[in-house]
Amino acid sequence: MTQAQASIIYAEEADVLNVAMFGQTAKQWREAHPELKGNIRDYASINELICLANMENINAVLIDEGVPQGDRLVRLNQIAINQMRVLENDDNRNLLK
């Protein structure tokens, strides 16, 4: 695999996570927000970034298990919804000081 091929695969997997978390690819976000610098993750909340980090690990496991990309996207979206619900509820409890 060439470096260019590896970069394309990495970008595609990053967009799987972006769609699961934010409902859009990085390109779609940039087109919707041309006035903003950076990328979608630069504007994510702490909880969204925590969720994304968890989803990256889960996605790696799903890839190792041979789960097709479409199925991974559905599962990761469900995981994102559940994790964000938990993280947002934890914020309200002030568990970390």
Regions of interest found by a model, annotated:
Residues 1-97:
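Positively charged, phosphate-engaging catalytic surfaces used for nucleic-acid and nucleotide handling
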